[in-house]
Amino acid sequence: MPGVNAKDVAQAHNMDVLMEHEHSCKCLTYWVDEMRGYVFCLIDAPSKESVINLHSKAHGLVPHKIIEVEHTLVQAFLGRITDPENALLTENGLKIVDDTSFRIIMHIQIEELSLRERNQKIEFDSKAYQSIMTDAKAHVVRHNGRIVSGEANEMLASFVLGEQAFQASMAIVDGLDDTKSADVRISLHAGLPVTQSDKLFGDTVQLLKRLNRMSRDTPLLITAGLKELLPEPLWASLPSTVRSIAPGDETFINDLFGILESHHHDEHFDIEKCCRMLALSQSQLYRKTTQLLQFSPNNLLKNYRLSRAKDYLRTTNKPVSQISFETGFTSASYFTKCFKAAFGLLPLHYQELSHNGLNQ
């Protein structure tokens, strides 16, 4: 919405409030980003059509996209689900909310941690996950971030300022203990709550998760959009633990992992088909994957399938043979051999340890 300003949006919001009961809606609050020409409204409504009719009757401005959201998720990402207490009141009583919904999102992924052989025993050390995540959450809060979600090996956080997100990430990286057998990956990206995805901050989170599937030699990766938000002294001298990624590479990674996500289960899917979908030659794809992801295309596809299989083993009770076929392996025995070579455990043993949370 080019040329949008907070006062006009406040007036439109008031018109919505006056007519909300006629459409069985409740207009809770909104966010305005004048610089980016973006408005995000939070409305309790029985249907998308009710929201469209309300806006159409109240002021004629039809929403570009409507998605369903959970209040708790909005609160986690944006920090509120009602009007801010410090909203400006004009002389005639108009409440003006001048608060952007643009956020910097942090995603942390811990790849396999403490699966190691000792005296012919396997130790599954869940305490290592907990220690890293506890420290990470503390640094997020200390730098004015908000924890959106946190699991044993994964976390999402939201920040208003790019500098705070970067400093929190650096504090997490600086606190990592080199003696821990952990591959901690942190990625930062900035975005708006509603774009192409039907999930809140869906496109931003999707890219972050794809970036954290990349094998890399630095724990922290930042996108070009995030780099632009940092003060010059910070991005002009990025430490060796940080890597920035160019916009064109972001697009390639999104396209590549989108294809892998959609086709990894197909046993007939191969690199030749992947090249056709990306409109690249095999040599071009090889150069890109080895440069960005440190894998040849064939190894990338195999490792992606193994990674997804590991996810399924950790989160489901499906038989190993079923998981092997669902991730594109034509033979359960070949899958078992590849899994053991990659992770040092038989798939069934890994599944049992993951579910039991053993700490021997």
Describe the function of each predicted region:
Residues 1-21, 76-105, 112-115:
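Short S/T/G/P-rich N-terminal loop/turn motif that feeds into the first structured element of a domain
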Residues 2-26, 123-141:
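Short amphipathic alpha-helical segments
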Residues 95-164:
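Catalytic NTP-binding/metal-coordinating core of nucleotidyl cyclase/transferase enzymes
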Residues 127-144, 156-192, 203-216:
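Alpha-helical scaffold within the catalytic cores of cyclic-nucleotide enzymes
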Residues 184-192, 215-240:
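A short beta-strand->alpha-helix segment at the C-terminal rim
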Residues 256-269, 289, 293, 310-319, ...:
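Basic, amphipathic alpha-helical hairpins
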Residues 271-300, 324-349:
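Basic/polar phosphate-binding segments, predominantly the helix-turn-helix DNA-binding elements
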Residues 291-330, 353-360:
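Terminal helix-turn-helix DNA-binding modules in bacterial transcription factors
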